[in-house]
Amino acid sequence: MRTGVYPGTFDPITLGHMDIIRRGAKLVDKLVIGVTTNASKSPMFTVEERLAMVRRETADLPGVEVVAFDSLLMDFAESMGAAIIVRGLRAVADFEYEYQMAGMNQQLNNRVETVFLMADVALQPIASRLVKEIALYGGAIDRFVPKRVVQEVVARVEKIGKKGS
């Protein structure tokens, strides 16, 4: 069985993430979505909330599993028996960062390959960071995230308070 890992913060999961998940799942028998804590980011949602969100949005996709991890990506990939890591690319800036990460990951474990998938052109501008910023200023995010996620983001923004109001 060929296993792949698609790691991310998914805070929140976007339509861009969903596109990469659907396409990445076609490349392997099992795609493990690794929801991570990222010390360099300030998440809007807890790991548990993000896990629930991603599990719900991927429930209808065969061969997709969603788990949390808090370790080096290559250690996580090895623990999942993964042969590949799936990464989405939106722009040249993504490539530069991901290329460097893939090189470091190869140094850590050369048995796992990194596979880059280009984002769908219509989804390239979408980033979780921008979705949160738009929502915090009261903008509509329904074109960027799954419908149920819109409700969760709006509810969280109402709880923490909008900016500029």
Swiss-Prot record:
One Pfam family per UniProt: CTP_transf_like
Annotated metabolic or biological route of this protein: Cofactor biosynthesis; coenzyme A biosynthesis; CoA from (R)-pantothenate: step 4/5
Primary localisation category: cytoplasm
Lineage: Bacteria, Pseudomonadati, Pseudomonadota, Alphaproteobacteria, Sphingomonadales
InterPro entries noted in UniProt: Cyt_trans-like (IPR004821), PPAT (IPR001980), Rossmann-like_a/b/a_fold (IPR014729)
Enzyme class: transferase
Family: Belongs to the bacterial CoaD family.
Source organism, top-level taxon: Bacteria
Feature type site, description Transition state stabilizer: H17
Catalytic activity: (R)-4'-phosphopantetheine + ATP + H(+) = 3'-dephospho-CoA + diphosphate
EC number(s) per entry: 2.7.7.3
GO molecular function, one term: ATP binding
Source organism per UniProt: Rhizorhabdus wittichii (strain DSM 6014 / CCUG 31198 / JCM 15750 / NBRC 105917 / EY 4224 / RW1) (Sphingomonas wittichii)
Annotated substrate binding sites: T9, K41, L73, R87
Subunit and interaction comment: Homohexamer.
GO cellular component, one term: cytoplasm
Localization of this protein: Cytoplasm
Gene symbol of the encoding locus: coaD
Protein name in the entry: Phosphopantetheine adenylyltransferase
Cofactor(s) annotated in UniProt: Mg(2+)
Any single biological process term in GO: coenzyme A biosynthetic process
Keywords: ATP-binding, Coenzyme A biosynthesis, Cytoplasm, Magnesium, Nucleotide-binding, Nucleotidyltransferase, Transferase
Residues that, per the record, bind ATP: T9, F10, H17, G88, L89, R90, E98, L123, Q124, P125, I126, A127, S128, R129
SUPFAM superfamilies: Nucleotidylyl transferase (SSF52374)
Role: Reversibly transfers an adenylyl group from ATP to 4'-phosphopantetheine, yielding dephospho-CoA (dPCoA) and pyrophosphate.
